[in-house]
Amino acid sequence: MNELHDGESSEEGRINVEDHLEEAKKDDTGHWKHSGTAKPSKFRAFIRLHFKDSRKFAFSRKKEKELTSEDSDAANQSPSGAPESQTEEESDRKIDGTGSSAEGGDGSGTDSISVIKKSFFKSGRKKKDVPKSRNVSRSNGADTSVQREKLKDIFSPHGKEKELAHIKKTVATRARTYSSNSIKICDVEVGPSSFEKVFLLGKGDVGRVYLVREKKSGKFYAMKVLSKQEMIKRNKSKRAFAEQHILATSNHPFIVTLYHSFQSDEYLYLCMEYCMGGEFFRALQRRPGRCLSENEAKFYIAEVTAALEYLHLMGFIYRDLKPENILLHESGHIMLSDFDLSKQSNSAGAPTVIQARNAPSAQNAYALDTKSCIADFRTNSFVGTEEYIAPEVIKGCGHTSAVDWWTLGILFYEMLYATTPFKGKNRNMTFSNILHKDVIFPEYADAPSISSLCKNLIRKLLVKDENDRLGSQAGAADVKLHPFFKNVQWALLRHTEPPIIPKLAPIDEKGNPNISHLKESKSLDITHSPQNTQTVEVPLSNLSGADHGDDPFESFNSVTVHHEWD
């Protein structure tokens, strides 16, 4: 996928290098000249590929003017008063061709790049035209003979092919850093055989999730293994690409972290952060009454709102919010997972800053309008969990990002009352309740005590008409500016102690959970040998010999996302 590759024009870089390697020739002086068919900017692109890290090289603009002058007497004169060195920033600007002109620049000493650059563009220059003053040096006075030899090797017949292959590999694997500057995508060798299974965490209709240990580092991960055959059979192939893309491009504390993705002949693999707290749904089941107090629920709803805001800013609609898809980090904070039902807008817009007329506090007076990022995006897919499906999805009239705010209201209600507001005896009754019934807040003796602001927020999130629903006009800004969240410090959510702190397994000396108390599942095919089990299980070794013809997963890229905190 193009989105996972380097944002720079790597193809253009490759073409330029090949052109110059073919056109570069050696003249009688032992220097290098060019055929004159390429523009100077192409040479700069070539030089940057080789000397990207050599920031101490400097150009002498006055020297360059003299060396390229037709008057040989002027060329033989040495510049006076030239500074000994040049700052790294000035050198970089001149390598880019964005520095001062030859007429207006200050002399600063020449180097091997200057000489090659001038002889490279001076096509047809003969030996007698070459100035006698050829004593070149680095700005710091060091000898450049090593650099000369390196460049000669580059342009030698044997060096051309070798260096071109090296440059292609460098350009292809150049790291992409996202706007947050905290994650990069790099090319590394990792595959199913790099991990060993430990335990089965869960399973679905097209795959399973395992706790795995990386053999090299000993770190634990959650490995999602998806069957290609089942995805094709159930027409869910595109969902794997959507999930990989969202996970690989997202960088948010409340969204699960992706580390590796790759494939074998039979399976797709998504290697993600192992959330030791498990499913949020399980944590709710262990609470008294299987529910939370209003203040406890407010904390988690605020974190989910922040995660949805980020997804909408990225142009994604989540569409599958429910307790089972929320994981608990070991710190107790939530992490959204399972993005296979998510949808991305093809024409995501830019967010706008809005000011609330009746802001609950000065710190919440301004917010980002996330609706503007996906304002014109509608989809007609009938997806979601039955009790969480929005009315517009049931009607089949298409839906927008407003469905995420409907599901947020259902989730909030379930946190407080341990049930969903429109649940019926069967699917048809549930859908009928969603379409026609208003939300009811129980008032029995042991019913939770809920404030009027809390009820007001839930009612506004569960408005049947998506155009009148809270969040339909300005997205997350509408929700965050509701008076119920008056005292929430959104920027400090990650540093607030959660109501539920998971009880974790003991930690070993390497900081990994001690899982010696867990019994290995008999369904796991650790030996990868069919003779040892009658149940066909997912192997974690690369399968071979399968011939799928037209493979719809051919473009499922192998990606490793490196995080700065690793």
From Swiss-Prot:
InterPro entries: Kinase-like_dom_sf (IPR011009), Prot_kinase_dom (IPR000719), Ser/Thr_kinase_AS (IPR008271). The modification Phosphothreonine is found at T379, T385. One of its GO terms (molecular function) is protein serine/threonine kinase activity. It holds the Pfam family Pkinase. Residues 195-485 form the Protein kinase domain. Its EC number is 2.7.11.1. Residues 74-85, 134-145 have a biased composition (Polar residues). One of its GO terms (cellular component) is plasma membrane. ATP binds at L201, G202, K203, G204, D205, V206, G207, R208, V209, K224. The keyword Magnesium does not apply. It catalyses: L-seryl-[protein] + ATP = O-phospho-L-seryl-[protein] + ADP + H(+); L-threonyl-[protein] + ATP = O-phospho-L-threonyl-[protein] + ADP + H(+). The modification Phosphoserine is found at S381. The keyword Transferase applies. Residues 119-129 have a biased composition (Basic residues). GO terms for biological process: phospholipid translocation; signaling. The active site is at D320. Residues 1-31 have a biased composition (Basic and acidic residues). Residues 1-39, 60-152 are annotated as: Disordered. Keywords: ATP-binding, Kinase, Nucleotide-binding, Phosphoprotein, Serine/threonine-protein kinase, Transferase. SUPFAM superfamilies: Protein kinase-like (PK-like). CDD domains: STKc_phototropin_like (cd05574). Belongs to the protein kinase superfamily. Ser/Thr protein kinase family. KIN82 subfamily. This is Serine/threonine-protein kinase ppk14. The lineage of its organism: Eukaryota, Fungi, Dikarya, Ascomycota, Taphrinomycotina.
